[in-house]
């Protein structure tokens, strides 16, 4: 599905550069930092925090509920935690696992750990049992820090004080530390608030975090984030792109175990020496109240967050806020302008980058409907959707797509853009492509389909696993979702491919959440036929009160694909499109059986 109207032209870049001219000082600062950070010269998150605490000690570093910490206070807090960790034997290269919901203690624990050269394993507090145990096994922590709100989650795994005598378990309220746990706050009392000497020795090439994949398609993998990548993100996305000022406040309701919070949001804040307002979790109903409460001038988004806000009823207060810019990824082109206009957002800094990726794209010039550009080596290559792998030509090498076309994004692995990979070496190797354009070259397979917009800009289209083939054509689920979401009454649409007996490829199916109880199958079919090629129109629909997502707003498609369109297995309304004029009709068990026998043409 092409979208030639979203190409980037020279005039767009010229306008973007002119808009950025008044802030060239911040841009130059970021450029200078990008140039000066070297893998083998001391520089780290801890040193950056200490630098701000020394230069601007009374500046507010963190807001949470009614609480406030200056940079001097927050740095001292992190130092006391570092002293506790050191007393328990933590040193450079060790892992400190953190299992808490969003609260200031998470950031203080992270800062304390990385100041020692240790690695913070950012556990997903939604995980339970075997999955959580798998995450802990991958990272082999010396210490596990558990918030009181996560005790049930931790003790559902094999890693807890009742069964594990190898590790030390620290507890941070609410409530008194249970048997087997040591009280972190009690142990902090009396510890020195001075900067640890170890911080001076931490090198950018050392790991700082383990960030876990969402696990929507299997067990999570632990991707490695180094200080080098974090610092480059701070400089490139924070200082060069967002260009926050010391008196700015960025609101982040995203989970701190995710890079959009820990690297993008916190990195941008530390890059400017401004304030982070931390939300407990995202709530569409409370979002703008929190923005006004903290006088936030920026916020970070991910995935469907913007759509959730746009789906809320419009109010006269929609523009009563101080937000001038937002940063994130996953804002769909079809709602970009509507969101920007309704809420009066001056600049949207969309970016592209995965936790394990070796480079990122940033929308430095504030252009519309783009994930931005990247100066580092990348290519967009032809992709075989049926085989789900890049297509090699007769000479064995890959071929680039033309401007305006969609292909697989691959990025070259070099000394300046290293691939840090996962803790699992086999999983790391599986993400690499070799002999791509010449013998011996190595490229990272992002697993994402993007559109070449020209001038080194890209637009995200789909995850590889979310693209399917039907009637000999490739169907990008996100573009079908865009057409569905444009239909009145549809609040959420999740599109995926399902197997049909006797048919090649996969037929399109959509799981929908609609406002009210009415559903006009004929009108929806007409709308989709006008918006999409015939092969891309979903043949099956499933109505749900609400779509299931991960904690980072990624739709859980695996279960939907597995369930298919069998009314005997699904207790929610199902529809099928057998006649384009008649529209969608109820999928009965009799119709399902006829489809299974190949009696109905789809």
Regions found by a protein language model. Name each.
Residues 27, 151-204, 376-381:
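ANL superfamily adenylate-forming
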Residues 37-50, 58-103, 107-111, 128-133, ...:
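Conserved AMP-binding/adenylate-forming core of the ANL superfamily
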Residues 57, 176, 189-212, 219, ...:
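Conserved pre-ATP/AMP-binding loop-to-beta segment of ANL
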Residues 70-72, 208-232:
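Conserved AMP-binding A3 loop
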Residues 106, 127-134, 144-146, 353, ...:
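AMP-binding/adenylate-forming catalytic core of the ANL superfamily
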Residues 186, 271, 293-301, 310-384, ...:
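Gly/Ser/Thr-rich phosphate-binding loop
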Residues 231-249, 259-297:
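Conserved AMP-binding/adenylation subdomain of ANL enzymes
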Residues 532-555, 572-601:
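AMP-binding/adenylate-forming catalytic domain of the ANL superfamily
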